[in-house]
């Protein structure tokens, strides 16, 4: 696969749709879980064990897992850390049944339809309009070969995907992912304006 082969990269790194819990989307417990992950499916006894684990580990870091999690008064067969050595304290905290339930949509592998609503500032940011309805992207395209413009667009796609959600607000995640998708459209729209 070449550096600028967007289709192959897309297959290996499918875009994440911007809905659901940022911590779950990013698989990163440094973000707060907003999903109340798993709390709806637990028995009352399992909920009690989660509460004990959370209380036993108050003030300890979220990235602890396995035997690093203090589990006194929690039977081994009911301890999630015993059943899944990779589960972190942050993930256990996300299952806290004492947290209010947030009914946010979960991401599914088939959730690949573009949003019906446009996100303001993505497709026509006013600061990129130069004069007489000429956009900066047109000037950029006209100053490059098709391969250079392809690299410029794919570089921006990569930039927006890498930074998506890093500002830890869902609105920024959605906007960054929308910008990444928009650069694909920009390449198709303006590649004919490039010089040979």
From Swiss-Prot:
Residues 97-118 are annotated as: Disordered. Keywords: Host-virus interaction, Inhibition of host innate immune response by virus, Kinase, Late protein, Transferase, Viral immunoevasion. This is Nucleotide kinase gp1.7. It comes from the Viruses. InterPro entries: SaV-like. Dodecamer. Its EC number is 2.7.4.-. GO terms for biological process: symbiont-mediated suppression of host innate immune response. Nucleotide kinase that catalyzes the phosphorylation of dGMP and dTMP to dGDP and dTDP. A double mutation in this protein and the RecBCD inhibitor gp5.9 protein allow phage to overcome the retron Ec48 bacteriophage defense system. This protein alone when overexpressed in E.coli does not cause growth arrest; Y128C may be a silent mutation. Transmembrane segments: none annotated. The keyword tRNA processing does not apply. It holds the Pfam family DUF3310. GO terms for molecular function: deoxynucleoside-phosphate kinase activity, ATP as phosphate donor; kinase activity. It comes from Escherichia phage T7 (Bacteriophage T7). The keyword Zinc does not apply. Coiled coil: none annotated. It catalyses: dGMP + ATP = dGDP + ADP; dTMP + ATP = dTDP + ADP.
């Amino acid at each position: 696969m070449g550096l600028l082969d967007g289709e192959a990269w897309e297959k290996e790194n499918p875009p994440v749709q911007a809905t659901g819990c940022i911590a779950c989307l990013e698989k990163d417990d440094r973000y707060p879980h907003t999903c109340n992950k798993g709390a709806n499916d637990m028995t009352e006894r399992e909920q009690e064990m989660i509460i004990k684990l959370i209380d036993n580990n108050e003030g300890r870091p979220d990235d602890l897992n396995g035997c690093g999690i203090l589990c006194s008064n929690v039977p081994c067969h009911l301890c999630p850390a015993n059943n899944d050595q990779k589960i972190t304290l942050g993930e256990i905290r996300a299952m806290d049944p004492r947290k209010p339930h947030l009914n946010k949509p979960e991401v599914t592998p088939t959730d690949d339809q573009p949003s019906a609503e446009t996100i303001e500032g993505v497709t026509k940011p006013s600061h990129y309009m130069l004069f007489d309805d000429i956009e900066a992207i047109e000037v950029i395209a006209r100053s490059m070969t098709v391969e250079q413009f392809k690299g410029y667009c794919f570089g921006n796609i990569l930039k927006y995907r890498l930074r998506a959600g890093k500002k830890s607000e869902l609105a920024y995640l959605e906007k960054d992912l929308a910008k990444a998708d928009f650069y694909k459209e920009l390449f198709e729209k303006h590649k004919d304006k490039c010089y040979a």
